[in-house]
């Protein structure tokens, strides 16, 4: 499991008690305190209501600051997702280019295999004339060329296998990122549904 970022820790702490669920109650309490302060019959009662108003205002300011902070973190998170999406698009484009290159290498390997078969057939024909000096020289040259082509074929096959493995890793990474994005979207929908439900519930 990866290290938890500071933004994730702050976000969890800010959301642990809901998201603005008590704002309406605080505002109602502030209005009631203001009315009582206006109608206070003594200095002590007025001072008490004044302190309550200050406390309620402080809570409202804190709630507003918390909401703004969560909103700012959500914006940064969306920017990060957009960046990841662009990186995925670039990776996919690069993968298509690698696939095209691998196809070219496969065609080259097929040509090498065909040439090798032709050289093998020619070598068998040459073997019927072992006494001719020039024929032996040609056979030796063909053997060297065949060995060289075999090395090329092995190199191409190794590169092709490496590209296949790299492409498999890339596809796995893309799939994991897509799953992460889908899970985040589902979580966001659940949170929005909960917020909507809390807003529609009657206040005690």
From Swiss-Prot:
Modified residues (N6-acetyllysine): 36
Segments for region (Disordered): 182-204
Alphabetic keyword roster: Acetylation, Coiled coil, Cytoplasm, mRNA processing, mRNA splicing, mRNA transport, Nucleus, Phosphoprotein, RNA-binding, Transport
Gene Ontology cellular component terms for the protein in this record: cytoplasm; cytosol; nuclear speck; nucleoplasm; nucleus; THO complex; THO complex part of transcription export complex; transcription export complex
One biological process term in Gene Ontology: RNA splicing
Taxonomic superkingdom: Eukaryota
Gene Ontology molecular function: RNA binding
Region (Interaction with THOC5): 50-137
Signal peptide (residue range): none
Coiled-coil regions listed in the entry: 146-204
Region of interest: Interaction with NIF3L1: 105-204
Compartment(s) where it occurs, according to its Swiss-Prot or TrEMBL record: Cytoplasm; Nucleus; Nucleus speckle
Positions of post-translational N-acetylglycine modification: 2
Residues with the Phosphothreonine modification: 5
Family: Belongs to the THOC7 family.
Function: Component of the THO subcomplex of the TREX complex which is thought to couple mRNA transcription, processing and nuclear export, and which specifically associates with spliced mRNA and not with unspliced pre-mRNA. Required for efficient export of polyadenylated RNA. Plays a key structural role in the oligomerization of the THO-DDX39B complex. (Microbial infection) The TREX complex is essential for the export of Kaposi's sarcoma-associated herpesvirus (KSHV) intronless mRNAs and infectious virus production.
Subunit-level organization: Tetramer; as part of a THO-DDX39B complex. Component of the THO subcomplex, which is composed of THOC1, THOC2, THOC3, THOC5, THOC6 and THOC7. Component of the transcription/export (TREX) complex at least composed of ALYREF/THOC4, DDX39B, SARNP/CIP29, CHTOP and the THO subcomplex; in the complex interacts with THOC1, THOC2 and THOC5; forms a coiled-coil dimer with THOC5; together with THOC5 and THOC6, plays a key structural role in the oligomerization of the THO-DDX39B complex. TREX seems to have a dynamic structure involving ATP-dependent remodeling. Interacts with NIF3L1.
Listed name of the protein: THO complex subunit 7
Organism in which the protein naturally occurs: Homo sapiens (Human)
């Amino acid at each position: 499991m990866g290290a938890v970022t500071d933004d994730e820790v702050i976000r969890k702490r800010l959301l642990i008690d809901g998201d603005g669920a008590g704002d309406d109650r605080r505002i109602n309490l502030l209005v009631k305190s203001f009315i009582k302060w206006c109608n206070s019959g003594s200095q002590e009662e007025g001072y008490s209501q004044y302190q309550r108003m200050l406390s309620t205002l402080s809570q409202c300011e804190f709630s507003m600051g918390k909401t703004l902070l969560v909103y700012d973190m959500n914006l940064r998170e969306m920017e990060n997702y957009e960046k990841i999406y662009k990186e995925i698009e670039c990776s996919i484009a690069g993968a298509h280019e690698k696939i095209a290159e691998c196809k070219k290498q496969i065609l080259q390997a097929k040509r090498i295999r065909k040439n090798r078969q032709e050289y093998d057939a020619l070598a068998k024909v040459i073997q019927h004339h072992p006494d001719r000096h020039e024929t032996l020289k040609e056979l030796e040259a063909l053997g060297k060329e065949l060995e060289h082509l075999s090395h090329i074929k092995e190199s191409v096959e190794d590169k092709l296998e490496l590209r296949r493995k790299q492409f498999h890793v890339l596809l796995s990474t893309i799939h994991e990122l897509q799953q992460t994005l889908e899970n985040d979207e589902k979580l966001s929908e659940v949170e929005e549904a909960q917020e909507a439900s809390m807003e529609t519930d009657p206040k005690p």
